[in-house]
Amino acid sequence: MKLYLVRHGKAEDSVDASGERPLSQRGMADVEAQAKFLDNAGVRVTNIYHSGKLRARQTAEILSALVAPGVALQKIDNITPMDDTTYLAQQIQSWNTDTMVCGHNPFMERMAARLLAGNDEASAVMVKTGTVMCFEKFSDTWVMNWMVVPCLTRDIEY
């Protein structure tokens, strides 16, 4: 099973009428470039989860069009910025298909540290907006196969 952890794309600095921060134009373009890259690499997932916050949901929507066409997006609890990683760590134990989770920092950095070092306080990776990380489980060990930041996919033409 592969687990794709995604930090939402760059959001507007100010909140909209509903009190949420939508993706900025740059954020949308970056996530679209990431989606094209993932599609070209053959990435497909059977589940996409998001935090419920607008910017994470928008990120999931853009990605799902190419890596999970027809798959319904699902909100998952306890993955907002300051949440503890324990809940998601427990949830992924029962997953057996390639899955994507769209969320926020510092949660995504702490979750990556937990998967790689067994400790969410370890300093393992820096996750910029729009970053996609691919983890794979071998026996009881998670490894990071790769990590792609938007500046690498922005200008690629397919």
Question: How should these model regions be labeled?
Answer:
Residues 2-79, 83-86, 90, 108, ...:
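Active-site-proximal alpha-helix that buttresses catalytic centers in soluble enzyme cores
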Residues 17-18, 88, 146, 156-158:
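Short aromatic-enriched loop/helix-cap "lid" or pocket-rim segments at secondary-structure transitions
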Residues 62-63, 114-115, 138:
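Residue-level signal for well-ordered alpha-helical positions
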Residues 68-70, 96, 139:
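Short, well-ordered coil/turn elements that cap or connect secondary structure elements
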Residues 92-102, 142-150:
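A polyampholytic, Gly/Pro-enriched intrinsically disordered region
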Residues 98-100, 105-131:
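Non-DNA-binding regulatory cores of transcription-related proteins
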Residues 119-154:
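Domain-level recognition of soluble alpha/beta enzyme cores
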